[in-house]
């Protein structure tokens, strides 16, 4: 697996750009993102391909995770890390919350048929439209718990195995069966993990008063019908550097109650068995002074350890240090140097100087060259005049000698 990843400082920088463009909204549309993307001077067809790759959920907009993907692709193209836009999103760039969509899209690209229209008669008055297939990290973690508690040896779920969950929900039996049929187009007695997560997601939204969707995206259906997907974390974890911590707040208080009673009965409530690891977008710091604060906190911890070490070493100061333990004075000195370095980097970032500048403006360089050229010409003219003056002085000296 590639060792490449999006560094934390990149995420913080991308957040500053995203926040300045989004006006407080969770997503950017094409026109909002166009200004910063076109500053890269990439061709329009390249930017279109970057957009298509980054828009993982295909909603025509970029949320923050997708924006990070787009920015990293653009920078890699500009810096020569990539010679062309890749055909598929690299595994290390796939956001954890959308890994199932990317995996399903890849399955679909091998030739799976398009999604079919699934008819239902869910026209119950009072239900809301606006169902969203996107699973936020906290909801997905809860679905994972329910799946893990009920899966059989083949990693599949039967309809009847979730009956206690159905009993705890405010969802009619007809709607539950409609959701099951939606994710189980082949009418199998059991469904795989992807289908189970989608099934629970539909029930969650229906529990909150949203109308059950009539169709299912082609990419999702392809993943439902593919029984060879490997879900072992050690074998396939395409988004290991993007894992959120599962603490994201849900949009409404009612949604947070989905499955809680059921999970409490199982003894796993609040303890998600699925814990993705990697970059935590929910902890992205928006304050540019964050780095200084964090380093000062680390320095305080080091000083506390230093004081403790000094107290423990009282009475043994004259003994030779042959135990290989670190010198806390040196550690403190290095930490202070690191703090000074980080503060200087932050200052350069704010002022747009130092290594933070990608290069001098070409036009300004040309102007400097012209100025230097003019100065050289002026110096040459001045030298010629001084040589003429010197020659004249020598002539006068010779004439004076002859006159004597």
From Swiss-Prot:
Residues 237-256, 307-326 are annotated as: Disordered. Residues 42-77 form the EF-hand domain. Signal peptide: none annotated. One of its GO terms (molecular function) is actin binding. Residues 307-324 have a biased composition (Basic and acidic residues). Ca(2+) binds at residues 55, 57, 59, 61, 66. One of its GO terms (cellular component) is endosome membrane. Residues 279-381 form a coiled coil. InterPro entries: EF-hand-dom_pair, EF_Hand_1_Ca_BS, EF_hand_dom, EH_dom, End3. Residues 10-100, 139-227 form the EH domain. It is found in: Cell membrane; Endosome membrane; Cytoplasm, Cytoskeleton, Actin patch. Keywords: Actin-binding, Calcium, Cell membrane, Coiled coil, Cytoplasm, Cytoskeleton, Endocytosis, Endosome, Membrane, Metal-binding, Repeat. It is a peripheral membrane protein. GO terms for biological process: actin filament organization; endocytosis; endosomal transport. Component of the PAN1 actin cytoskeleton-regulatory complex required for the internalization of endosomes during actin-coupled endocytosis. The complex links the site of endocytosis to the cell membrane-associated actin cytoskeleton. Mediates uptake of external molecules and vacuolar degradation of plasma membrane proteins. Plays a role in the proper organization of the cell membrane-associated actin cytoskeleton and promotes its destabilization. Belongs to the END3 family. Component of the PAN1 actin cytoskeleton-regulatory complex. This is Actin cytoskeleton-regulatory complex protein end3. It comes from Aspergillus terreus (strain NIH 2624 / FGSC A1156). The gene is end3.
